From Swiss-Prot:
Pathway the protein acts in: Nitrogen metabolism; urea degradation; CO(2) and NH(3) from urea (urease route): step 1/1
GO molecular function: nickel cation binding; urease activity
Family assignment from sequence similarity: Belongs to the urease gamma subunit family.
Organism: Rhodopseudomonas palustris (strain BisB5)
Reactions catalysed according to its record: urea + 2 H2O + H(+) = hydrogencarbonate + 2 NH4(+)
Compartments in which it is found: Cytoplasm
EC number: 3.5.1.5
Protein's recorded name: Urease subunit gamma
Gene Ontology process terms (BP): urea catabolic process
SUPFAM superfamilies to which the protein is assigned, alphabetical: Urease, gamma-subunit
Length: 100
């Protein structure tokens, strides 16, 4: 299987998000990379499902709460930007203050 660098990045984010979800299920608080991965994966999959950029910008800030992350993680992540493939092309989705 020959994957492009972009496809490899998407696969890595998806795998990291799967690990993060399992940790959440066990009650483990997420670290920085896990929080980024789970929100990024939510955006990529939402775009694939046909949601709009505006919907994902709003919903992306509701994926995780401060209580689900280690202390200080919410303050470390000011914005998350993800290039996602929508039915009408690739667009940049920015989520401001993604962990509230």
């Amino acid at each position: 299987m020959n994957l492009s660098p972009r496809e490899k990045d998407k696969l890595l984010i998806s795998m990291a998000a799967m690990v993060a979800r399992r940790r959440l299920e066990r009650g483990v608080r997420l670290n920085h990379p896990e929080a980024i991965a789970i929100i990024s994966d939510f955006i990529v999959e939402g775009a694939r499902d046909g949601r709009t950029v505006a919907e994902l910008m709003q919903a992306g800030a509701e994926v995780l709460t401060r209580e689900q992350c280690m202390d200080g993680i919410a303050e470390m992540i000011h914005d998350i930007q993800v290039e996602a493939t929508f039915p009408d092309g690739t667009k940049l989705v920015t989520v401001h203050q993604p962990i509230r």
